[in-house]
Amino acid sequence: MSRSIKKGPFVKESLLNKIVEMNKAGDKKVVKTWSRSSTIFPEMIGHTIAVHDGRKHVPVYISEDMVGHKLGEFVLTRTFRGHGNTEKTTSVK
């Protein structure tokens, strides 16, 4: 179910304020955030945002195609390490 139109898209205010200030100053620093649920706004295009995956911050470069999506969609939280080994071991009974 999508978010109500009357509420509008969610973005953490402090994150948006940092991006707006960087746009005014012309800076391109990496911004750390734990807010995976924030929606990507057009003001964020061209910036790198380090999104927390539960263990570390993963840098995500924001491009035009990402606008409208959530930050957490681009950082995986689970790593697949493979199924069990296929080696046959001989056991002495």
Curated annotation (Swiss-Prot):
GO terms for biological process, alphabetical: ribosomal small subunit assembly; translation
UniProt superkingdom: Bacteria
Keyword Methyltransferase: no
One GO CC term on file: small ribosomal subunit
Matching PROSITE patterns: RIBOSOMAL_S19 (PS00323)
UniProt cross-references to SUPFAM superfamilies, sorted A to Z: Ribosomal protein S19 (SSF54570)
A GO term for molecular function: structural constituent of ribosome
Keyword annotations from UniProtKB, A to Z: Ribonucleoprotein, Ribosomal protein, RNA-binding, rRNA-binding
Pfam families for the chain: Ribosomal_S19 (PF00203)
Family: Belongs to the universal ribosomal protein uS19 family.
Function according to Swiss-Prot or TrEMBL: Protein S19 forms a complex with S13 that binds strongly to the 16S ribosomal RNA.
Protein name as catalogued: Small ribosomal subunit protein uS19
Native organism: Clostridium acetobutylicum (strain ATCC 824 / DSM 792 / JCM 1419 / IAM 19013 / LMG 5710 / NBRC 13948 / NRRL B-527 / VKM B-1787 / 2291 / W)
Gene of this entry: rpsS
